[in-house]
Amino acid sequence: MATSAPPIPRVELAYAPTPLLKLERLSAELGVELWVKRDDLTGLLETGNKIRKLEFLVGEALAQSADTLITCGTLQSNCCRCVAAVCARLGLRAVLALKGAQPAEYDGNLLLDRLLGADIRYCTDAEWAKIDETLHDIAARERAQGRTPYIIPESGATVVGALGYLACGQEVAQQVRHGAPEFDTIAITDFSGGSQAGLLMAKQLTGLRAEIVGVPIEIGRAHV
């Protein structure tokens, strides 16, 4: 007898669904009908798309009885700040491996990381060059202290993390069914490619007609 797949662990963190907003004046200026998906409204310290990924990453972490989340990024990483905020909200320990030296003064996301109680490790260029190994070394030290760590790669770029934007794409499809335009293109910025991958999965599963276009930022198209 066929059995259904087990539910995918998920922690509801985002304020969703986020609205679709037509950019009236910009559309008139450019002669193209433009809409924006307001994922800047997902909540929890302006976490944007990161919180959607973390719903599934943290869900998997908790399913594995993790009490510590380990991730990495630049000194002003939005993703690291988001992980720190989620850990503060859920009572988990956050360990952030950040690229660069400890500054004399703290500002921006780095200041928020500290205020949120994250344990910050500053990585040398050599440590950053082998960041996967560095993260596993940190995890080993956490285990030696009796903790149960869960590693989140930079920007949450895993298959599990991509499920966040599968859910977002399903949300868009639902909004289209309830009166939003049938978009012919959905454009999204690309760093790791995870969010675009999630939208492509949603396109296949929901029948969205839009072409999913990723626009690389900071790194080249070949890397994405």
Segment roles from a protein language model:
Residues 1-221:
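PLP-dependent amino-acid enzyme catalytic core
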